[in-house]
Amino acid sequence: MSAHPVDTVTAATATPDVAQPFKELGLKDDEYARIKEILGRRPTEAELAMYSVMWSEHCSYKSSKVHLKYFGETTTDEMRSSMLAGIGENAGVVDIGDGWAVTFKVESHNHPSYVEPYQGAATGVGGIVRDIMAMGARPIAVMDQLRFGAADAPDTRRVVDGVVRGVGGYGNSLGLPNVGGETVFDESYAGNPLVNALCAGAMRVEDLHLAFASGAGNKIILFGARTGLDGIGGVSVLASETFDGDESGTGRKKLPAVQVGDPFTEKVLIECCLELYAAKLVVGIQDLGGAGLSCATSELAAAGDGGMHINLEQVPMRATGMTAAEVLSSESQERMCAVVTPDNVDAFMEVCKKWDVLATVIGEVTDGERLTISWHGETVVDVPPRTVAHEGPVYERPVQRPASQDALVANTTAGLTRPESADELKATLLKMLASPALCSRKWITEQYDRYVRGNTVLAENADSGVIRVDEKTGRGIALATDASGRYTALDPYAGAQLALAEAFRNVAVTGATPKAVSNCLNFGSPEDPGVMWQFQQAVRGLADGCAKLGIPVTGGNVSFYNQTGSTPILPTPVVAVLGVIDDVHRRIPTGLGLEPGETLILLGDTRDEFDGSIWSQVEHGHLGGVPPKVDLEREQLLADILLAASRDGLVSAAHDLSEGGLAQTVVEAALAGETGCRILLPDDADPFVTLFSESSGRVLVAVPRTEETRFTGMCTARNLPWVRIGVVDEGSDSVEVQGQFSVSLAELRTTFEGTLPALFG
């Protein structure tokens, strides 16, 4: 027991005027006053710790909640028809047919990944994996969305090295394939990288588990790793003191607020959980992530039909002298909290013993309505659990379109110098291919295991990851994540829809049917009205887009305060789309050359759209104007045609067009298939626009000559624009833009793949 005096509920009642460090814990004056109003007294030290972490921006969504409700308002009953769990649960769950369900979610671990890149990224992966485990599923794949400062900035190498090793080290050790994602370099992320991790899990529909504590007398069991000092206050400012200072005269060094992960403990925990689920030993379950036991106990109790009592001294600790507040606030990793009936406790413990997982009964469900916590026989917490978990402050922050937005939009690319000659076009292609914005991410992805477990069908560098779920039928899923901070900065509403459209298209390109969306909304300070305008517009754009496409948002995450000083990051709404494919054997790959003499057909309209483009960034360091037009009805039509083409075997390869335009897509497809091709520019087309425009809603498909008439006839009949843009020449070792230039595959590969190893290898 800590030598620190215990602040009990009795003591708090008797000493109402004791000064408390609520501001140091991130609480405002009015929030502290509200806590005292709820309790009818001042909070104890332990209660104050609980409220401070649970009412933090990260846990309470206090600045975003008024806007996030728009997702629910725009979701129809039809959209919800295949959704088994949605917003408010640990992760969304979707019925994918044949008795299977898939759960998926994106979470952020941004700030810890700057302070301690390896552990920040590793525990970001570990945390999202436990969210998936808590739904009753076996985790089957991970993805990541990474944002770093300028590639040549002094500190970027440190952050990139740690984050990539952290993502790979944790995911690889768990035996989870990393099937895709994005990595972006931009100076706005210097000092504030983004690490957004996605995990997907699969289960039978009847195996779904939810987080609630029900049934008076049922036991609360904490199992997994011991509880330590690492991660205290990771979601608030509980660890705001300097890391090397002495803490409270205890003689202990204060550890950073970044958690420390052990993937091998988590791997065993996964198998233990799955056996517990199979044996029907779990009533309710919650992982311990942000806010630790404060979150797990209050959320379980708030979602149940009674109260809860916890004997906090029963929590297994790996540090001596911890206080009750520290135990409640610790974010030590690899821990779960389960609700178990008394007659199943012994069987539960036997399963944990089999897997060498430490498990301890720390409390029970009560027939009251309060969450009480004792510490060595004295009550240190006595609260209504909903006030901790769900009834925190809600702010309607000022929303104001920035005055600078007009100038940003007016600053178009119209006056920028464009390449005209064949040599200039070739030089532009090679410069863009070699740029950190577009170069190969192979140096990163090769540090991840993409095919472990044997169910990965497509992974990086495909447009989406495709994973088999059912070995017997071949049923599987496709996952894609996308975001564009540049487009969102120009128009947050359109930028969010462009990210949605691309992720939707990336799933459709593989032959899968898009079914559901998760998101991770990364923005600057909510106290800035301009940032809140960006956030509001992005939420509305994403919600309206999902409604138009008929797919629901099943959950997500909001990360605010992503800025250095007063300069926010580019607004970055990350969108993840889950698709279903009834047989992974009919998936459409990216690489050319599967069929000799394939015809290359470009689907969709190409317009002169360069505002916010990678070309404007790489060639001119420019950001301004209006982002490309979004046509979600066209995206749906495109998806329908790709699905039909996949089922009928009409296309042998497909790759979506996005950053870098047609030129980038052709090079990636040619290198993936190790096959050259000829690009035939339309006579009336501007070569620069054709090659580098970033118009949305376009896909390059390779069609066997025997199927060309059927495929183009289907497109014409459904009013989808198409143009025959090239041919795959058997045995060709170059990409030729007829009438302009030719580049060998060897030069393209060297140019494309050499940048990141030179910078970070």
Swiss-Prot record:
Give the organism's phylogenetic lineage. Bacteria, Bacillati, Actinomycetota, Actinomycetes, Mycobacteriales
Give the UniProt family note: Belongs to the FGAMS family.
Enumerate the subcellular locations listed in this protein's record, separating them with semicolons. Cytoplasm
Spell out the protein name for this chain.
Phosphoribosylformylglycinamidine synthase subunit PurL
Q: How does the record describe its quaternary structure?
A: Monomer. Part of the FGAM synthase complex composed of 1 PurL, 1 PurQ and 2 PurS subunits.
* Keyword flag Phosphoprotein: no
Associated pathway: Purine metabolism; IMP biosynthesis via de novo pathway; 5-amino-1-(5-phospho-D-ribosyl)imidazole from N(2)-formyl-N(1)-(5-phospho-D-ribosyl)glycinamide: step 1/2
Q: Which organism is the protein's source?
A: Rhodococcus jostii (strain RHA1)
Which biological process terms from the Gene Ontology are attached to this UniProt entry?
Answer: 'de novo' IMP biosynthetic process
Q: Where do the annotations place Mg(2+) 2 binding?
A: D131, D287
